[in-house]
């Protein structure tokens, strides 16, 4: 209940709690990942979103594990939020923002390709807003891959 109030509240007291949660989004995401190993917890998150459909899905999206265990698809929770709330612009915007929150070393191309693979799976999504978001994001990722490929080639040529 306390976290729900912090994530959903609109009063000044809840803004401080939200700020604290946002200060360490990486740790928050890791906490949610560990909590969501139990399928009943997943159902509770979805129920909470159903109880507060105008605010909860967007509040929780930045803290969800993005990918399944194999890393080749979006997580079940992300897909469920898109299925139920994918017409909410803020949900889609926050999913896009979450794509840039993981860390990497070396060439970033593999990371973009992983994201592109997951986003491409949304091209036939039942919600039009999700399909539009996926097309736009897919185009952006392809451009980033192209740009980074050129950068990697230039960097490689410098060190020959």
What are these regions (language model features)?
Residues 1-160:
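Non-catalytic all-alpha helical scaffold/repeat segments
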């Amino acid at each position: 209940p306390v976290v729900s109030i912090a994530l959903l509240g609109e009063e000044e007291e809840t803004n401080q709690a939200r700020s604290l949660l946002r200060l360490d989004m990486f740790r928050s995401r890791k906490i949610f990942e560990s909590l969501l190993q139990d399928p009943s917890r997943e159902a509770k998150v979805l129920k909470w979103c159903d109880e507060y459909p105008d605010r909860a899905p967007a509040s929780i999206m930045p803290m969800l594990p993005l990918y399944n265990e194999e890393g080749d698809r979006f997580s079940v929770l992300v897909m469920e939020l898109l299925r139920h709330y994918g017409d909410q612009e803020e949900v889609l915007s926050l999913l896009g923002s979450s794509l840039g929150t993981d860390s990497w070393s070396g060439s970033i191309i593999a990371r973009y390709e992983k994201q592109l693979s997951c986003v491409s799976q949304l091209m036939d999504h039942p919600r039009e807003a999700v399909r539009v978001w996926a097309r736009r994001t897919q185009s952006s990722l392809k451009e980033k891959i192209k740009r980074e490929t050129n950068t990697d080639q230039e960097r490689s040529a410098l060190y020959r």
